[in-house]
């Protein structure tokens, strides 16, 4: 397969798919069973694997892992407010407080487990910890990231992509294994159709197989897109939340 897609192009595909998915939640609240919302949500399943993949790639390419980690957590905090505002369950300022209205799932955005996924990868590759300590820390991170969108599965997928770097088949197998666990929980706890629908993440693998290992051709465009990718997530959620709340 020809390597025709760079990182910027794959990330643009991811945010397009994400936007389609979030518009579907706005237009068709709940677990709508019509063909259009289901197709839109299937398209949306492209996003999380691509995001996880490039969080892991960022670990290997960043010049400063500490700044990279801080940046992810900063945008996780910012995105929490945008995510809560965009939620169909948003009532008032109390909705920004996790667990305030009960429930345990989807208390904050996917940026939270993505940031913890980077920490998980750092732990796995660290020489400071014994294998037992690494295992316990991974379990702890799973607990901390569990109540978010995509739960600890996003963190584990970052770990899978990072520790199997260069072996897309192994990356894909582990990613599908973790998402299958998520799909089972979704199937029994939330909605059967939408549980099965989570497995559409497999559609991201042919796209990742085309990744050429390059960030992009133009340095200025690369710098612009770096911040665009960070800012787009909370900004588009804020806009969708405003449409839902004031519309």
Question: Where is each model-derived feature located?
Answer:
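Alpha-helical transmembrane segments and their immediate juxtamembrane cytosolic regions
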Residues: 1-247
